[in-house]
Amino acid sequence: DKNVKNLTIKTDNEVAFNIPSGNYGKVNLTVDAPNADVVNAGTFKSINIKAIKPNTWKEKAKGNTITVTADDARIVVEAGASLSKVTVSQEGGKIKIEAAGTIDAIQIEAAVDVSLAVDGTVGEVAVSAPAKVAVEGKTTAAIPIKVEETAKGADVTSSTPVEVKAATEISLNLSKGAEGSKVETTGENAQVAVKNDTTEVIKVTTPAGTQEVAKDTTSKVDNAGKVTDTTTNTNGDNNGGTTGGNTSGGNTSGGGSSSGGSTGGDVTPAETVTIYPSVI
């Protein structure tokens, strides 16, 4: 139906949905399927992931915007695919984002745990709530992370280079692999507690000048350039990690939404559902 503007996939059954390549630029897609896997190659006006099986949403398309309101989700942007933006807005959630392709922007709007694995490209991560963000990956390009004033208490951990701009009080844990990271305070109340477990000095730029946090030490640096609470680290920690996903299956029903039945176990589904372009 070419007049469909809102499509909802809703089921509690164990299913796998394949959405083939196609331009559905007038359709808002909502997925409310806590036991489903989704492989998406279609381009939509918007995508809202309300619930999905913790393991996998596989993105193969280019240019989609995804909002994650699920408590637990894993989004994989495959090589050659891209997302314009991912917004994470469910407080208390645990979200994994894996970027083998490109993500232009990630917006974290709630106190959630976000694990970000970057083998491709991420344009910017904006944090506007006291979230925990763990970054890893094979990328050698520094990932820009902007921590806004409303994110007091945010915690950022990275084993890959990052460029952090902090407008409030945050913790920044840098482990081996994060050499070359840059830190800047951008607000009157900014203070960055830098734990430096890299092999190099980490420089913190403030309006009053640049301060240094030596390797194997932790220091707090505020917006006035004051350095306090310097201690020696006892050990270095690497955080983050990725997990694999499974596919599952079910049946479709009409009315712009999908539901499925399952005769399989936790690993092997009954069948896979393909939503064809002609349906939507």
Language-model features: locations:
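Short, T/G/N/S-enriched strand-turn elements that build extracellular solenoid repeat scaffolds
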Residues: 1-186, 190-207, 211-216
